[in-house]
Amino acid sequence: MKLKIKKLNQEALIPAYQTKEAAGFDLHSIEDVIIKPGERKLIGTGLAFEIEFGYEVQIRPRSGLAFKHGITVLNTPGTIDSDYRGEIKVLLINHSNEAFEIKKEERIAQAVIAPVVQAEIIEVEELSDTERGAGGFGSTGK
């Protein structure tokens, strides 16, 4: 699988896997940004992707930002479809009680390539019965 990346801004950083067995690669901010407590910000990367058909790129939080600072990806995982050609942006939220400063070139999220399966969608009058039925939201245990 090949991921083609175009710089939309010459100062953008091309991502790379940090270890031989890493599942994801880090995305970097193209700008300095301050996220106030409870605030959401859309952070640009200055990059556009050409993703092979049959795959998506999932945008996920960086565990260190979430654990140490309460900064996470709001719509996790965010999905970048293979036919999207615009700038890759990351929607971050600050769950902490303090403003958080993101510096230009700082790692803000990780991206993971995943296969896509499109289902054949069929409208039916009835669904098959199961032991679980319509039970949800904690119905299978305490």
Curated annotation (Swiss-Prot):
Cofactor(s) this protein requires: Mg(2+)
Coiled coil: none
EC assignment: 3.6.1.23
Transmembrane segment boundaries: none
Keywords: Hydrolase, Magnesium, Metal-binding, Nucleotide metabolism
Pfam families, alphabetized: dUTPase
Domain of life according to the entry: Bacteria
One Gene Ontology MF term: magnesium ion binding
One example of a Gene Ontology biological process annotation: dUMP biosynthetic process
Alphabetical list of InterPro entries matching this protein: dUTPase (IPR008181), dUTPase-like (IPR029054), dUTPase-like_sf (IPR036157), dUTPase_trimeric (IPR033704)
Residue sites binding substrate per the record: 62-64, 75, 79-81, 89
Catalytic activity: dUTP + H2O = dUMP + diphosphate + H(+)
Pathway: Pyrimidine metabolism; dUMP biosynthesis; dUMP from dCTP (dUTP route): step 2/2
NCBIfam families for the chain: dut, PRK00601.1
Family to which this protein belongs: Belongs to the dUTPase family.
Role of this protein: This enzyme is involved in nucleotide metabolism: it produces dUMP, the immediate precursor of thymidine nucleotides and it decreases the intracellular concentration of dUTP so that uracil cannot be incorporated into DNA.
Name used for this protein in its record: Deoxyuridine 5'-triphosphate nucleotidohydrolase
Protein source organism: Nautilia profundicola (strain ATCC BAA-1463 / DSM 18972 / AmH)
